[in-house]
Curated annotation (Swiss-Prot):
It comes from Methanospirillum hungatei JF-1 (strain ATCC 27890 / DSM 864 / NBRC 100397 / JF-1). This is Probable bifunctional tRNA threonylcarbamoyladenosine biosynthesis protein. One of its GO terms (biological process) is tRNA threonylcarbamoyladenosine modification. It is an enzyme of class 2 (transferase). Gene3D superfamilies: 3.30.420.40, Phosphorylase Kinase, domain 1 (3.30.200.20), Transferase(Phosphotransferase) domain 1 (1.10.510.10). PROSITE patterns: GLYCOPROTEASE (PS01016), PROTEIN_KINASE_DOM (PS50011), PROTEIN_KINASE_TYR (PS00109). It catalyses: L-seryl-[protein] + ATP = O-phospho-L-seryl-[protein] + ADP + H(+); L-threonyl-[protein] + ATP = O-phospho-L-threonyl-[protein] + ADP + H(+); L-threonylcarbamoyladenylate + adenosine(37) in tRNA = N(6)-L-threonylcarbamoyladenosine(37) in tRNA + AMP + H(+). Required for the formation of a threonylcarbamoyl group on adenosine at position 37 (t(6)A37) in tRNAs that read codons beginning with adenine. Is a component of the KEOPS complex that is probably involved in the transfer of the threonylcarbamoyl moiety of threonylcarbamoyl-AMP (TC-AMP) to the N6 group of A37. The Kae1 domain likely plays a direct catalytic role in this reaction. The Bud32 domain probably displays kinase activity that regulates Kae1 function. Fe cation binds at H105, H109, Y126, D279. L-threonylcarbamoyladenylate binds at Y126, A127, S128, G129, A130, D158, G171, E175, N251. Residues 1-318 are annotated as: Kae1. The active site is at D437 (proton acceptor).
Length: 520
């Protein structure tokens, strides 16, 4: 049955945009807010949206069929901007006497990417001004596998650009300048499936190197971080398709890195047409249309905007569970996101492999640093009572250690094993060791006991924040891969409290970290 065209209105931040979408895009009109100087001013942006929204919508509707529904960006975003769009959408829906549909902005980026690529079950890197997230579909929702712990990559780049007096938006200008640059070392912050950009931006601002070198290195470092956590998500989920969405996705170097990584993993990669990458009304209209087909409409009285609306809060009624999604097979069981593991004579050799997408100097630095740190911290964790493999030999890129003949925790999740895992992590944190990558792939189960492996991102810290981030990584993985995540998290917490005196303070911090990611 033919649905008919849906009107979509986007206005979460910079761009006021509207579109009409039927089986394909009919018309798209955008009118972005451009500040005189500095970054976005929410009230000024809202005033801009209010001043142009009527003309933008009139231009979209002129000469086209009357929409059968009105969709609008309900969140996340800037409250003043969202309220302008929400008010207009309600008025139009009542005027046309058609259904109203509230669309999650992040989910809309994912759905327009799926439409443009034809991919069915991809991992999605969403890289924009305010958001940096790696998402994928599981059990009726889009799960967030990893995300920024501080600011979005686009905002990070724009902050650096403003500090150097570069015009807005800063991303294209930095990309242009970077073409003539050379690499200089800058901070690289990846914490399991999450990442952080504030330290990188601060170091780039303070760097005394030529501007072209700093721009080049800022891109090389930030985009390598994004590519690394995206590869982890592909490895963790066993998915074989990747889509890049969001305004930062227009950067050719980021596209090149992701394409290179996917080629090495035999994964398919797609980037939508530029008109679908940044914030746009087409993604709202298209997502509204698929939601309308599944009956996901809003009564006007329940259409309040939500500035903190996360993608994983949306019940995805318009998709079916892909076949095999319960198993999440990892086609790279012998080759994870960072290393190849070879087994021989009761030993496991973990060999860190070079990544073609990373700058060679950065690649060598990370391999050497992570190999040395891993060997040292495995030994320290073992002294603290944590079950880890015994180290036998170390080289520049290889650790030879005892082979633990077990299965990954992700393949046998249970409350009993998560409670045991909590006790183990409690011992680790009590010894002031932070693992840095507490995913369910890095716990092995052998004879009913859990063993902790892969200390490549580990470090020492007595900081509450660092230990909270450690647990946040694990909780994110549980939420994105298990329908019983709440039960499993409670079991972990019970075990953790047994061994970690500061457990409540750390767990409260983990909750604060989760809330920070609502809209950054």
């Amino acid at each position: 049955m033919k649905i008919g065209p849906v009107l979509g209105i986007e206005g979460t931040a910079w761009n006021l945009s509207a579109a009409l979408f039927d089986d394909d895009l009919i018309k798209l009109v955008s009118h972005p807010y451009k500040p005189v100087q500095g970054g976005i001013h929410p009230r000024e942006a809202a005033q801009h949206h209010a001043s142009v929204i009527t003309s933008v919508i009139e231009e979209v509707l002129k000469g086209n069929p009357t929409p059968v529904a009105v969709a609008f960006s309900q969140g996340p975003g800037l409250g003043p901007c969202l309220r302008i769009v929400g008010t207009a959408a309600r008025a139009l829906a009542l005027s046309f006497d058609v259904p109203l549909i509230g669309v999650n902005h992040c989910v809309a980026h994912v759905e327009i990417g799926r439409f443009a690529s034809g991919f069915d079950d991809p991992v999605v890197l969403y890289a924009s001004g305010a958001n940096t997230q790696v998402l994928g579909y599981l059990q009726g929702r889009y799960r967030i596998f990893g995300e920024t712990l501080d600011i979005g990559i686009g905002n990070a780049i724009d902050k650096f650009a403003r500090s150097k007096g570069l015009p807005h938006p800063g991303g294209p200008e930095i990309e242009r300048i970077a073409k003539n640059g050379s690499y200089i070392p800058l901070p690289y912050t990846v914490k399991g499936m999450d990442l952080a950009f504030s330290g990188l931006v601060s170091a780039a601002k303070d760097a005394s190197a030529p501007l072209e070198d700093v721009c080049y290195s800022l891109q090389e470092t930030a985009f390598a971080m994004c590519t690394e956590v995206t590869e982890r998500a592909l490895s963790q989920t066993g998915k074989e398709q990747l889509i890049l969405v969001g305004g930062v996705g227009m950067n050719k170097r980021l596209q090149e890195m992701l394409s290179c990584m996917c080629e090495d993993r035999d994964a398919a990669f797609s980037v939508p047409n530029p008109q679908y990458l940044g914030d746009n009304g087409a993604m709202i209209a298209y997502t509204g249309r698929v939601m309308l087909e599944s009956g996901s409409v809003l009564p006007v009285e329940e259409s309040r905007v939500n500035p903190s609306y996360r993608a994983d809060q949306v019940l995805v009624t318009w998709r079916e569970e892909p076949s095999g999604s319960e198993r999440h097979p990892d086609a790279y069981s012998a080759r994870g996101a960072e290393a190849i593991v070879r087994f021989c004579d009761g030993a496991a050799s973990k060999i860190r492999v070079s990544k073609r997408y990373r700058h060679p100097e950065l690649d060598r630095r990370l391999i050497a640093e992570r190999t040395r740190a891993e060997a040292r911290l495995i030994a320290e964790a073992r002294k603290a009572g944590v079950r880890t493999p015994i180290i036998r030999e170390i080289t520049q890129d290889t650790i030879i250690m005892e082979h633990i003949d077990g299965v990954k925790l992700k393949e046998c999740l249970s409350p009993e094993l998560l409670e045991e895992t909590g006790r183990m992590v409690g011992k680790l944190h009590a010894a002031q060791i932070v693992h840095g990558d507490l995913t369910t792939c890095n716990f092995l189960v052998h004879d009913g006991k859990t063993w902790l492996i892969d200390f490549g991102l580990a470090g020492t810290s007595s900081d509450i924040e660092h230990r909270g981030v450690d647990i946040h990584v694990l909780f994110q993985v549980l939420e994105s891969t298990s329908k019983d995540s709440d039960i499993l998290k409670e079991a972990f917490i019970q075990g953790y409290r047994e061994k970690m005196p500061l457990a409540d303070e750390i767990l409260n911090r983990e909750h604060e970290i989760e809330l920070r990611g609502r809209y950054l």
